[in-house]
Amino acid sequence: MAPNIRKSHPLLKMVNNSLIDLPAPSNISAWWNFGSLLGICLLTQILTGLLLAMHYTADTTLAFSSVAHTCRNVQYGWLIRNLHANGASFFFICIYLHIGRGFYYGSYLYKETWNTGVILLLTLMATAFVGYVLPWGQMSFWGATVITNLFSAIPYIGQTLVEWAWGGFSVDNPTLTRFFALHFLLPFMIAGLTLIHLTFLHESGSNNPLGIVSNCDKIPFHPYFTLKDILGFMLMLLPLTTLALFSPNLLGDPENFTPANPLVTPPHIKPEWYFLFAYAILRSIPNKLGGVLALAASVLVLFLTPFLHKAKQRAMTFRPLSQLLFWILVANLFILTWVGSQPVEHPFIIIGQLASLTYFTILLILFPIIGALENKMLNY
C-alpha cells in the first residue's frame, strides 16, 4: 500500500494527529466547542488587528485621529475596527464559558492543561487592557491611569515600578508607544501558549460530560467534530457580524468618543464589561493594597481549583449540591459584573462587598466542603 503523506510527512502528521485522526470521546457536548471557537477568535483578532495596525499611529497627537481616519477613509476600515472591538467581547464570552465548562466537568484535574489555560486567560486580559488604551479616548487614558496606578500599592518598589511602566511621571506618549508594542506582541504569545495548551491536552485526551475514562469509546475528530466545530463557527460568527454591523458601539463607552484629556476626569471610570467582575472585587475593599490583592486573587484563585477538588466523582453531572453551588457562583458573577458598572454609592458598595465575599467563600470553602459531603452521601 502506498504511504499516506498525511501520516508520514513530519509537519502534516502533526496536523493529522491534532485535527484529523485525533481520538475524541463520542459523547462530548456543545460545551466542548469553545476551545475551537477561541482559536477562531484568536485568528480573527490577529487578522483584523494586523489590518488595523497598518493604518494606526502610536502617538498621542495622532492616535485618536488615525483611528477616526481608519473608520472614515480606509476601505471597510469601519468594519475591520468594529469586528476587532466586538471580537474582543466574543473572545471573553468564549473563554468564560470555556472555563465554566472546565470547572463544571472537573477538567481542571488535567493540571498542566488547566494551568496553561489560566496563564492564557491572564495574557488575554493583559492584551485586552493594553489594546483598550490605543484609541486614546477619555476612557482609554483614564482606564490606563487608574489600572497602572494600582502597581503603586506594592510596598517599597511600587511608585518606581509605575513610573518605569509609564516611561515618565504620568500616562503619556511613551506609555502609548509601549502599549502598542505590547498589544502587537502578546497575541503571538497567546498563539504560542495555545500550542502548549493543546500539547498538554493531547497527552491525556479530552474529558467528557460523564467525567469517566472514555478510552473504550473514541471516534476520529474528522469528520465528526470538524463538522460540529464548523457549525459552532457559524453560530458564533453570525452574532459577531450582527453586532459589528447593527450596533457596533453597544458594548463600548460613549466617553471614548472624546479625545484623551488629562485635565478632565470622566464622572465614572469603568473598564469594558468583561473586566467588571474583577473591578467590583477591587472596589469592594476600602484599602489600596487590599483591593489590588483581591483583584489578583479573583483570577489567580483558578490555579487552586485542582487542589480544592475533594469529590470522588470528577464531573458535577451527578452531584446536585455542587451543581446548585456552581449556578449560585454564576449568578454571583453576574451580580459582580452589574455592581462594577454602577457608581460607588449606597447600596452598590455593600452589594459589591457581599458578592465579593460570596465569590471567594464559594470557591475556597464551600466547594471542597460540599464535595466531601457528597462523598459521605454516596454511602447511603
UniProtKB/Swiss-Prot annotation:
Membrane topology type: Multi-pass membrane protein
Annotated TM spans: 34-54, 78-99, 114-134, 179-199, 227-247, 289-309, 321-341, 348-368
Subcellular location, principal: mitochondrion
A GO cellular-component term linked to this record: mitochondrial inner membrane
GO BP terms in the entry: mitochondrial electron transport, ubiquinol to cytochrome c
Residue runs in coiled coils: none
Subcellular location per the Swiss-Prot or TrEMBL entry: Mitochondrion inner membrane
Residues at which heme b b562 binds: 84, 183
Keywords tagged on the record: Electron transport, Heme, Iron, Membrane, Metal-binding, Mitochondrion, Mitochondrion inner membrane, Respiratory chain, Transmembrane, Transmembrane helix, Transport, Ubiquinone
Pfam families found in the cross-reference section: Cytochrom_B_C, Cytochrome_B
Cofactor dependence: heme b
Lineage: superkingdom: Eukaryota
Cofactor note text: Binds 2 heme b groups non-covalently.
UniProt binding sites for a ubiquinone: 202
GO-annotated molecular function: metal ion binding; ubiquinol-cytochrome-c reductase activity
Positions with a binding annotation for heme b b566: 98, 197
Note: Heme 1 (or BL or b562) is low-potential and absorbs at about 562 nm, and heme 2 (or BH or b566) is high-potential and absorbs at about 566 nm.
Similarity-based family: Belongs to the cytochrome b family.
Identification of the protein by name: Cytochrome b
